[in-house]
């Protein structure tokens, strides 16, 4: 029997879902980061770990991997060099098809029909599928892109907290959260920043939301800025022809109330998720982002 696996991999986690050839659910699991820009070996290891755990739920084992066609919707796959490096790795599966996490999410959100999505989680990216073509805005990775993401919001938070420590801007309760995290040691923040990954900055986003709802001025400022960034991408997608846009990801799903009313009118609920989108192209090499790979 053949099995089909959908993978949704981002900067924070990798989620796997297995279905049999009748489309019946077999198992689902989550592992670590699968952003291929952070290392193709790490990403493949996370993929295999998630599939292994999901397989166990359905009474399967690694012996069944050669019967599995895997659709990979991974962050960072838009980078051609990284895409090729990932695809050149040895793997135990029947086939792998690799496209971006945004592509998988858009397919899932509109069940394969035309439409657009705006993803904002650890990273951010907007994508429109229309007329057989793919249009992308943003998504060029932290720190040079990914506006509207948890990572950029967390970076801005750290910057503002340091300004508050210097007496340049007012200190708020949200500043205390960050300083407590680093044991009130600015040198620790500086040292941490030298190796901090997008998910490390993104870890502060839940606190930003909760403090904004409590009226914290800094948190409100950060959310307004994040909403403006996301709205910028939504307008760009609309100009490219998007009539229906789904908000996806931990930040985007919570930011809708912060968007302007005209923009909110374009928002629709996703019909499914990125894992289902990845399942749609499992075993279908024509969905590979680049066609000259292995």
UniProtKB/Swiss-Prot annotation:
Q: Where is the signal peptide?
A: none
Residues that bind substrate, according to the entry? 101, 139-141, 146
Q: Which GO terms describe its cellular component?
A: cytoplasm
Task: Tell where it localizes.
Answer: Cytoplasm
> Which E.C. number(s) belong to this protein?
2.7.1.8
Residues where ATP binds: 12, 122, 202
Name the predominant localization. Answer: cytoplasm
Q: Does the keyword Metal-binding apply?
A: no
Tell me the keywords, alphabetical order: ATP-binding, Cytoplasm, Kinase, Nucleotide-binding, Transferase
Q: Which GO terms describe its molecular function?
A: ATP binding; glucosamine kinase activity
pH dependence as annotated = Optimum pH is 7.5-8.5.
Query: What are the BP-aspect GO terms?
Result: phosphorylation
Hydrolase as UniProt keyword: no
Notes on temperature effects? Optimum temperature is 40-42 degrees Celsius.
What is the catalytic activity of this protein?
Answer: D-glucosamine + ATP = D-glucosamine 6-phosphate + ADP + H(+)
Please state what class of enzyme this protein is: transferase
A Pfam family of the record is BcrAD_BadFG
Q: What's the stated role of this polypeptide? A: ATP-dependent kinase, which is specific for glucosamine. Does not show kinase activity with any other sugar.
Q: Which family does it belong to?
A: Belongs to the eukaryotic-type N-acetylglucosamine kinase family.
Listed name of the protein: Glucosamine kinase GspK
């Amino acid at each position: 029997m053949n099995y089909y696996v959908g993978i949704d991999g981002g900067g924070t986690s990798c989620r796997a879902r297995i279905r049999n050839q009748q489309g019946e659910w077999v198992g689902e699991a989550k592992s670590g980061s699968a952003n291929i820009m952070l290392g193709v070996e790490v990403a493949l290891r996370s993929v295999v770990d998630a599939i292994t755990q999901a397989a166990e739920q359905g009474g399967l084992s690694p012996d069944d991997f050669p019967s599995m066609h895997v659709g990979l919707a991974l962050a960072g796959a838009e980078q051609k060099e990284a895409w090729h490096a990932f695809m050149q790795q040895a793997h135990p599966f029947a086939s792998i098809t690799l496209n971006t996490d945004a592509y998988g999410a858009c397919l899932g959100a509109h069940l394969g029909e035309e439409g657009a999505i705006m993803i904002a989680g650890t990273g951010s990216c907007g994508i429109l599928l229309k007329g057989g073509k793919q249009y992308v805005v943003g998504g060029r990775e932290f720190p040079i892109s990914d506006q509207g993401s948890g990572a950029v919001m967390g970076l801005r938070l750290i910057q503002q907290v340091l300004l508050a420590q210097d007496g340049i801007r007012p200190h708020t309760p949200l500043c205390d959260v960050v300083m407590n995290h680093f044991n009130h040691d600015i040198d620790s923040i500086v040292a941490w920043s030298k190796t901090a990954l997008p998910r490390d900055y993104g870890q502060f986003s839940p606190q930003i939301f909760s403090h904004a709802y409590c009226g914290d001025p800094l948190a409100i400022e950060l959310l307004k800025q994040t909403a403006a960034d996301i709205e910028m991408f939504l307008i760009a997608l609309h100009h490219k022809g998007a009539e229906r846009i789904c908000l996806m990801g931990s930040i985007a799903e919570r930011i809708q109330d912060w968007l302007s009313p005209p923009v909110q009118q374009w928002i629709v609920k996703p019909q499914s998720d990125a894992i289902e989108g990845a399942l749609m192209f499992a075993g279908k090499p024509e969905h590979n982002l680049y066609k000259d790979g292995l």
